[in-house]
């Protein structure tokens, strides 16, 4: 029997504790879980891709079956095929997330009907955490330590120093 391989993607700009929770839970469902940082190289992100990748790798270091990969200018289904993933993992906080994800699921299924999508609901303590919310708090100098993993906080601090 072949390994169960999943792919969880996002921009992770920055990664939040909500992302971490979904990844930890998804890692128990698969033999191998790839966490794909998808980014637009022509768009200035909050954190450079190198910082995001390094922060994610540190935050996920305790999960032996999880590997962080970065991609740009590629469709998620193409990355999934390349990595041998047969399942996409998505996190849902609310009905708006479901509606947003449903359109992607439609296109992904049209492009590759053998790749399934599973949805993991956010835990109540993470329902209102978002990367954009964290960026907004940072913009106004607020403490974000309770919203992001320590390794991400370190990357943000290091980036601010430069």
From Swiss-Prot:
Pathway annotation: Cofactor biosynthesis; coenzyme A biosynthesis; CoA from (R)-pantothenate: step 4/5
Cellular component, GO annotation: cytoplasm
Protein name, as recorded: Phosphopantetheine adenylyltransferase
CDD domains, per database record: PPAT
Site keyed Transition state stabilizer: positions: 19
GO BP field: coenzyme A biosynthetic process
EC number: 2.7.7.3
Subcellular location: Cytoplasm
Originating gene: coaD
Catalytic activity: (R)-4'-phosphopantetheine + ATP + H(+) = 3'-dephospho-CoA + diphosphate
Residues that bind substrate: 11, 43, 76, 90
Binding positions (ATP): 11-12, 19, 91-93, 101, 126-132
Description of how activity is regulated: Is inhibited by a series of cycloalkyl pyrimidines, which also show suppression of bacterial growth.
Cofactor(s) this protein cannot do without: Mg(2+)
One Gene Ontology molecular-function label: ATP binding
Xref: Pfam families: CTP_transf_like
Family: Belongs to the bacterial CoaD family.
Alphabetized Gene3D superfamilies for the sequence: HUPs (3.40.50.620)
Function: Reversibly transfers an adenylyl group from ATP to 4'-phosphopantetheine, yielding dephospho-CoA (dPCoA) and pyrophosphate.
Organismal lineage: Bacteria, Bacillati, Bacillota, Bacilli, Lactobacillales
Description of how the protein assembles with itself and partners: Homohexamer.
Highest taxon of source: Bacteria
Biotechnology: PPAT is a validated novel target for antibacterial therapy against Gram-positive bacteria.
């Amino acid at each position: 029997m072949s390994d169960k391989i999943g792919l969880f993607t996002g921009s992770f700009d920055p990664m939040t504790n909500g992302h971490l929770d979904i990844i930890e839970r998804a890692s128990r469902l698969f033999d191998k879980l790839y966490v794909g940082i998808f980014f637009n190289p022509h768009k200035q992100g909050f954190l450079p891709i190198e910082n995001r990748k390094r922060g994610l790798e540190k935050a996920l270091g305790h999960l032996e079956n999880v590997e962080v990969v970065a991609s740009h200018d590629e469709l998620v289904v193409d990355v999934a095929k390349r990595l041998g993933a047969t399942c996409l993992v998505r996190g849902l906080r609310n009905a708006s997330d479901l509606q947003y994800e449903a359109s992607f699921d439609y296109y992904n299924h049209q492009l590759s009907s053998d790749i399934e999508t599973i949805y993991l609901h956010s835990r109540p303590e993470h329902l209102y955490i978002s990367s954009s919310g964290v960026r907004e708090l940072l913009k106004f100098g607020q403490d974000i330590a309770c919203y992001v993993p320590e390794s991400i906080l370190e990357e943000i601090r290091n980036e601010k120093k430069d």
